[in-house]
C-alpha cells in the first residue's frame, strides 16, 4: 500500500479501533473524555480508545459498552492489539484529553470527570505495567488527536492552544 493509499481510521465516542502503518488513527470531541493510544513501535500498530467515564460501575444499563469506561477499555484495547500481533511487553501509552470543560462552584470531585478519567486510565495502565510516554491532559479545551503508528507521534489540535505533537 502506498502512502497515498493510507487511510485515517476514525474512532467514535466510547469506541475503540486498531490501525497499522501506513494508516493513521483519529478521534475528536475529547473534552472530559480521554483518548488513550496504546502502541507497539516495532509492529507499527496502535489502538485508540475514546474513554468517556472512569468506572463501569457508573453504567445504568445491563449491556456494557466496554470502550466507554476506563476500567474496562484499557484491557479491551490491549486484547485487540495482542490479536493484531502486538507484544504486551512492547506496549506503550500516550494520552490526551481529560479537560474540565465546565467550572462548578462545588468542589465535589464527582463532578471532575476529566481528571478522574485520567487517573483511572493511569491506574489501569499501571496494573498492566504499560508506561505513559507522554500526555496532554487537563486544562479547559477540547481536543482532536491523530496518531501515526510509524513515527509514534500523537498530533493534538485544540481551538484555544492550536496544535502540538507529543
UniProtKB/Swiss-Prot annotation:
Chemical reaction(s) catalysed: L-glutaminyl-[protein] + H2O = L-glutamyl-[protein] + NH4(+)
Domain of life of the organism encoding this protein: Bacteria
Gene Ontology MF terms: protein-glutamine glutaminase activity
Function according to Swiss-Prot or TrEMBL: Deamidates glutamine residues to glutamate on methyl-accepting chemotaxis receptors (MCPs). CheD-mediated MCP deamidation is required for productive communication of the conformational signals of the chemoreceptors to the CheA kinase.
Quaternary data: Forms a complex with CheC.
HAMAP family registered for this protein in UniProt: CheD (MF_01440)
Name used for this protein in its record: Chemoreceptor glutamine deamidase CheD
Species classification: Bacteria, Bacillati, Bacillota, Bacilli, Bacillales
Gene for this chain: cheD
Amino acid at each position: 500500500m502506498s502512502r497515498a493509499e493510507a487511510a485515517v481510521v476514525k474512532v467514535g465516542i466510547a469506541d475503540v479501533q486498531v490501525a497499522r502503518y501506513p494508516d493513521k488513527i483519529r478521534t475528536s470531541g475529547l473534552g472530559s473524555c480521554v483518548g488513550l493510544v496504546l502502541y507497539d513501535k516495532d509492529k507499527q500498530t496502535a489502538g485508540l480508545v475514546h474513554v468517556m467515564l472512569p468506572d463501569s460501575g457508573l453504567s445504568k444499563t445491563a449491556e456494557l459498552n466496554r470502550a466507554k469506561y476506563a476500567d474496562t477499555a484499557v484491557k479491551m484495547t490491549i486484547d485487540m492489539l495482542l490479536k493484531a500481533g502486538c507484544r504486551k511487553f512492547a506496549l506503550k501509552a500516550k494520552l490526551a484529553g481529560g479537560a474540565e470543560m465546565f467550572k462548578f462552584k462545588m468542589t465535589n470531585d464527582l463532578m471532575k470527570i476529566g481528571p478522574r478519567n485520567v487517573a483511572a486510565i493511569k491506574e489501569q495502565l499501571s496494573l498492566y505495567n504499560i508506561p505513559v510516554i507522554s500526555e496532554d491532559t487537563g486544562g479547559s479545551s477540547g481536543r482532536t488527536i491523530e496518531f501515526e503508528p510509524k513515527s509514534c507521534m500523537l498530533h493534538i489540535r485544540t481551538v484555544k492552544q492550536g496544535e502540538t505533537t507529543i
